[in-house]
């Protein structure tokens, strides 16, 4: 059985008709009361019992012995036969000044394009198109009777579309030259000449340049009637009006009435007779009593009244619209637009109208899907997207990896390596990275004295095997000009997890049981790095992947060599080999201890073991946090930058003076490079090394990057802090002064404009290559576009010119969307995207185009088309090459859709994001009834619904899966949609489900 309302069984239809017809049939079948047959006969009301033979368009009036038929107002005849009266078929055209449309029993006046019907329902008034969106004109909009004209500012001329303006060219005779002389449209002709054309409704003058207005455009500028003559349009007025002195508009003549009355009556008695005669003639049954709206017959004649939103005029018959917006803005929060009989409130962009249809509420765009790639910050009426460190915002909402190495080599002195979300500096062989992570320091050999070890490994015999403790200290500064020995070991722990828990045994507790002579390993290191990675996931039941049951730990050690270790019999190379051999033995011991689960860590004074399972504190439900995490509102939160996790206090604390920490989730703070100079250090909670204080400022340098500092010499500059050298301007260029901080301080031979960089070899400005841009003057580099974006051309000046060429969208069986490349930024040139929507069986496609932005000045070089197949002859559902900010919804004319978007190398625009839904084809009639109803788009409030991503998602969810309707309560529905929208849908659905009610 089909969906209710889409078809009923024949038996059900018959039953329904029977129920509808049964009461009148039974009433007609009841015999008259026999008790009344002997009495006096009573009049039979033939009209009430349906025994008359009056025409369907006639009124039946009962009389004492019979009945009388009379045709309804608007019809003519003797009552048994009535035919429609054509009120338009007279010399007055029904009183209409433009077109008169006859309808059964009545008539209606309509106006030409560019006019609107006056409140009297007969006259036509000019519509000022310039009031809304400047008439679509780019520069100047001038209203004229029946139409409007776009004009351009000085130095521009009107393009062929008669709306946009193009800058004039001073060179050559062409359509780009201001002297082409065409009144309207200029077309390039062979041999370098031009040809003039006119807009529709105009004719080309004899001089083949000027354009003459005709009655076909804006009614020739006439308010009422227009007639074409050799001199142009000639205006005239309806008989009840006279022509104004301007020769175009019409004024109502004084004393003009539609009824024929004697104008020379002089006596009061004659006047009274006329009034009485007119009162007797006036009735609501004839021409609605002359009332505009509601008519009621009273003892003194007809009484006219007006519906809500109108006020009765002094003539007692005409209803005039009330402009509610004139009083307290109609109660609207933002905008009020008067309509005939009512008004509409609307909101500023970024706000939505609440269900009271007056109040405006900020739209929280950050609560919607796909608003921003990374972070979203909501503001009243708008929002801002932000990117994580190491990423750059492009196209308003997207984040792409920043190539830091493209600008001054990332600040690296030697090698810059870009990574996703970051970068790192590296040094050539024979150099080591300075503490500032940018400069490189030459390796000179080894220091004369040993440094305090930062890491110690202590292993001892315990229970027949080795037990190892790895202790990591903090507060030690690493030197960078020594020879080091590096080694590493990887071992596996079964049933392990990459998390730590408090150790049950500490080195202090073990020491009494491990005399010094029983120590198998006792080594110190300057650096250690531990990494943990889980093993492979194992397939489990039902094809699911179980969590790995093992983990792998890799420990990297770095040990420095010292002068005292070198002897006459063992040089530096010999010392390194001995050290490597000793370390390999130590690592074998460590590996055996780890396999026996006797490997322990001490980090920042906290003793830890590798955890088998996520541990919990005994007697508590609070989860034990991982390393570098503290509790915050019963949740484990990583300690933020500028703090570290203290194991003894079991909480995050601020880095003390003389230390810093620029990462989250750490168990120690790094020492500042000059801990002895505590007086110059910043207060606690230092986020990075630059907070340590005493650093050389931009334009300065020193051997270690700390004070005392020197100014950069002439011909050099330095934009960073804490550097050991300055950058050369190159090409022998001097600087304007000592202590220069940027290349812009270098005295170049020419200043390069944005989109260019200065080449210090040729001393010329070079255009930025594709994929780069430069927004500033006088730079010696171009910035790489973020992520996978590139530019349409070289010489780009702004990040907005970096565009992602990937075609956007997500295609699903039930819902999805298509999106122009780089949306919501401008799409790139020469794009070509193709999508195919192929819904499941017995489903159809509904598409909503909230808005689309395509440049109309490109002669349809950019377009979006939706067809059944790629063939240009296949059934086309939608095609456009223009901008439409008014939304539209439509169903596909074919069961599947082939969609293509193409752009040329000309102008670009924002493009589109078009959602779609597939629905059960049993609802086809209902969906088409809704989307084809003009009321869906009549008000701005309804239009905003089709632009609201949250509301469209809810509507599509129910259309795709009707059972999901029950996810939304009635209260939620009322809060989501305006009442007028709900009423529209309710009437459609009710008629669809109960067509026979």
UniProtKB/Swiss-Prot annotation:
<feature type="disulfide bond">
    <location>
        <begin position="347"/>
        <end position="360"/>
    </location>
</feature>
<feature type="disulfide bond">
    <location>
        <begin position="366"/>
        <end position="376"/>
    </location>
</feature>
<dbReference type="Pfam" id="PF07645">
    <property type="entry name" value="EGF_CA"/>
</dbReference>
<feature type="domain" description="CUB">
    <location>
        <begin position="807"/>
        <end position="919"/>
    </location>
</feature>
<keyword id="KW-0106">Calcium</keyword>
<dbReference type="InterPro" id="IPR001881">
    <property type="entry name" value="EGF-like_Ca-bd_dom"/>
</dbReference>
<dbReference type="InterPro" id="IPR049883">
    <property type="entry name" value="NOTCH1_EGF-like"/>
</dbReference>
<dbReference type="GO" id="GO:0005615">
    <property type="term" value="C:extracellular space"/>
</dbReference>
<dbReference type="Pfam" id="PF14670">
    <property type="entry name" value="FXa_inhibition"/>
</dbReference>
<feature type="disulfide bond">
    <location>
        <begin position="325"/>
        <end position="336"/>
    </location>
</feature>
<dbReference type="InterPro" id="IPR035914">
    <property type="entry name" value="Sperma_CUB_dom_sf"/>
</dbReference>
<feature type="disulfide bond">
    <location>
        <begin position="54"/>
        <end position="69"/>
    </location>
</feature>
<feature type="domain" description="EGF-like 2; calcium-binding">
    <location>
        <begin position="84"/>
        <end position="125"/>
    </location>
</feature>
<dbReference type="Pfam" id="PF12947">
    <property type="entry name" value="EGF_3"/>
</dbReference>
<feature type="domain" description="EGF-like 6">
    <location>
        <begin position="284"/>
        <end position="319"/>
    </location>
</feature>
<dbReference type="InterPro" id="IPR000742">
    <property type="entry name" value="EGF-like_dom"/>
</dbReference>
<dbReference type="GO" id="GO:1902732">
    <property type="term" value="P:positive regulation of chondrocyte proliferation"/>
</dbReference>
<dbReference type="GO" id="GO:0042802">
    <property type="term" value="F:identical protein binding"/>
</dbReference>
<dbReference type="InterPro" id="IPR000152">
    <property type="entry name" value="EGF-type_Asp/Asn_hydroxyl_site"/>
</dbReference>
<keyword id="KW-1015">Disulfide bond</keyword>
<keyword id="KW-0325">Glycoprotein</keyword>
<comment type="subunit">
    <text>Interacts with SHH via the cholesterol anchor of the dually lipid-modified SHH (ShhNp). Interacts with PTCH1. Forms homooligomers and heterooligomers with SCUBE1 and SCUBE3. Interacts with VEGFR2.</text>
</comment>
<feature type="disulfide bond">
    <location>
        <begin position="88"/>
        <end position="100"/>
    </location>
</feature>
<keyword id="KW-0446">Lipid-binding</keyword>
<dbReference type="InterPro" id="IPR024731">
    <property type="entry name" value="EGF_dom"/>
</dbReference>
<keyword id="KW-0245">EGF-like domain</keyword>
<feature type="disulfide bond">
    <location>
        <begin position="111"/>
        <end position="124"/>
    </location>
</feature>
<dbReference type="Pfam" id="PF07699">
    <property type="entry name" value="Ephrin_rec_like"/>
</dbReference>
<dbReference type="InterPro" id="IPR052071">
    <property type="entry name" value="SCUB_EGF-like_domain"/>
</dbReference>
<feature type="signal peptide">
    <location>
        <begin position="1"/>
        <end position="28"/>
    </location>
</feature>
<feature type="domain" description="EGF-like 8; calcium-binding">
    <location>
        <begin position="362"/>
        <end position="400"/>
    </location>
</feature>
<feature type="region of interest" description="Interaction with the cholesterol-anchor of SHH">
    <location>
        <begin position="845"/>
        <end position="854"/>
    </location>
</feature>
<dbReference type="GO" id="GO:0008289">
    <property type="term" value="F:lipid binding"/>
</dbReference>
<dbReference type="InterPro" id="IPR026823">
    <property type="entry name" value="cEGF"/>
</dbReference>
<dbReference type="Pfam" id="PF12662">
    <property type="entry name" value="cEGF"/>
</dbReference>
<feature type="domain" description="EGF-like 9; calcium-binding">
    <location>
        <begin position="401"/>
        <end position="441"/>
    </location>
</feature>
<dbReference type="GO" id="GO:0045880">
    <property type="term" value="P:positive regulation of smoothened signaling pathway"/>
</dbReference>
<dbReference type="Pfam" id="PF00431">
    <property type="entry name" value="CUB"/>
</dbReference>
<feature type="glycosylation site" description="N-linked (GlcNAc...) asparagine">
    <location>
        <position position="657"/>
    </location>
</feature>
<feature type="disulfide bond">
    <location>
        <begin position="860"/>
        <end position="881"/>
    </location>
</feature>
<dbReference type="GO" id="GO:0009986">
    <property type="term" value="C:cell surface"/>
</dbReference>
<keyword id="KW-0732">Signal</keyword>
